[in-house]
Regions:
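C-terminal motif of bacterial Sec signal peptides marking the signal peptidase cleavage site
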Residues: 17-19
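Residue-level signal for mature regions of secreted extracellular proteins and peptides
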Residues: 13-14
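A short, solvent-exposed, low-complexity linear motif enriched for acidic/polar residues
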Residues: 23-257
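Bacterial N-terminal signal peptides that target proteins for export
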Residues: 1-8
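Polybasic, lysine/arginine-rich low-complexity segments
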Residues: 2, 22-23
């Protein structure tokens, strides 16, 4: 299947901190040097949470760019997470290890949408950066190097391996579109340059930068960053996309309006 070059261009972060403080006359504990936080992704379309359905009769209908969409599957990969402190320094989270620093987010598995980051330096953070996909130098189906992520991305309910190449799918969307429920299938990822060597051509990995509306305080109390991903931008972003049926050769043609 031809790779779509659609990239979700708008991801908005809102920050919710759960903490409490009280005045201590004489502190008895040292300030912790490491803390944890959670990045929770919430997938929406417009202002509506996305609900999946096994088939067209059970999937919820959404309107995007005047087109009806229904979703049966939504998955994508997040990796290369970095947090920027208020002093401008950057803390990288296992950026060279897909087993501990890359995640397959699966809309049908709510727990997979919560990325638990542990052993972070305590303090205040003002920005979060991450890659949508996997950067070129790590985008290889290397089971021996990253067995955990390889298995997670390749298991039956994920299927984020490309069949024709050595890299990973970055996005996998399945569902239906139009009033007559035509099949919707959007798979994105880096293109292949040479089918013999499986060399990567166009690198589709993209970095997302989120400036937090309020500093994230990592310390002894739990903290949470809620990141909202608006799938309306799939068709209704800066470039409007109109879906059309496949032609006789099995190739679809996206039409910009």
């Amino acid at each position: 299947m031809k790779n779509s070059k659609i990239v979700f261009s708008t991801i908005i972060a809102s920050l919710a901190l759960f903490s409490c403080t009280k005045k201590e006359e004489t502190p008895t504990l040292e300030t912790p040097t490491l803390g944890n936080t959670t990045l929770e992704f919430q997938n929406i379309i417009g202002s509506n949470p996305i609900e999946l359905g096994a088939d067209a009769s059970t999937a919820k209908s959404y309107i995007s760019n005047n087109q009806t969409l229904k979703f049966s599957e939504i998955k994508y990969i997040i990796s290369n997470i970095r947090l920027v402190r208020t002093d401008g320094s950057t803390i990288s989270y296992n950026v060279d290890n897909l087993d501990t620093g890359a995640f397959v987010l699966n809309q049908s598995n709510p727990e997979s949408l919560k990325l638990h980051l542990s052993d972070l330096q305590t303090g205040a953070y003002k920005e979060i950066l991450f890659d949508y996909g996997i950067r070129k130098e790590l985008n290889h189906l290397d089971e021996s190097r990253f067995p955990k992520f390889y298995k997670e991305a390749g298991k039956n309910d994920s299927r984020m391996h490309w069949e024709w190449g050595k890299g990973y799918r970055f996005t996998k969307i399945e569902g239906f579109w139009g009033n007559d429920n035509k099949v919707l299938s959007v798979h994105t990822g880096s293109t292949i340059k040479d089918r013999d060597t499986k060399a990567i051509g166009v690198d589709a990995c993209r970095t997302v930068k989120l400036v937090l509306p309020k500093n994230l305080e990592v310390g002894s109390n739990p903290s949470l960053v809620v990141i909202t991903a608006d799938f309306d931008k799939l068709l209704n972003g800066s470039q409007k996309i109109t879906l059309v049926e496949e032609d006789e050769d099995g190739e679809g043609n996206d039409v910009s309006t």
